[in-house]
Amino acid sequence: MGPGDLVLEIGPGRGALTHMLARRVDVLVGVEVDPELAARLRRELADLPHVHIVHADILSCDIGQIVLERARGAQGLRRFMVVANLPYCITTPVLHKLLSASPLFEAFTLMIQLEVAQKLTATAGSVGYGELSLMAQYYTRPEILFTVGPTSFAPPPSVQSAVVRMTVSKSPCAGDLDPGELFAIVRAGFAKRRKNIRNSLVSSALFGGDHDLVAAVLGSAGIDGRLRAEQLGLDEFARLARAAVALGAVHAVDRKSGGESGDVD
């Protein structure tokens, strides 16, 4: 990260990373939910006009609006990036929100729980593979850069952490599909992990017990209904989604390009 970059830092806290980033990038936007910490950072960085500390909850604010408003007037910006040391308790919802807003960004660099990092990079048939893996790999190319032990923190957590880089894919491999259509099928497939894909789809709200429709979708997609969802890769789920759309089982739903609106100070 350097000149020409806008960086969104989620949860800057006491500002250890914030102060370092402020010296390197052209625009820095920190979103902090704690009002006292946000006010403290504003005071400490008041002489740096390119640094913007926003008091808001990242889960309820509009990420795109926050970033684009702070980018206005800046010259020569080439890339928008995200940096965060995410609290374990909100890692998954923040990831979902970032992935939905991914077209705005070049990459995310995140410190997260190692178990979650392994889910992001998991492949079909491996431990931890699921909906989050598919979302991450549809929108980005995730990779684990390095692990961080508990002794690096005070107080030390009971789990390992990892730093991951998620480079945004500008041309998703299933780009012909609306993401809502694709992930409606993914969610239906993983709703009953212990069942095979046929039974999981049949029992989902999406298909409402329609055995014939599920059989038609599986047949059209060329998917063996005896397989489980965790055995199917992104390409197989994309084939299922295309078949479901063609047969009228799935419509354009759950379209998301950013976040929901929320209070920002």
Segments (PLM) and residue ranges:
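Short, glycine/charged-rich beta-strand-loop motifs at protein surfaces that mediate ligand recognition
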Residues: 184-188, 200-205
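General structural signal for alpha-helix termini and helix-helix connectors
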Residues: 169-172, 203, 223-224
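Catalytic cores of RNA-modifying enzymes
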Residues: 1-188, 219, 230, 239, ...
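RNA substrate-recognition surfaces in RNA-acting enzymes
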Residues: 207-245
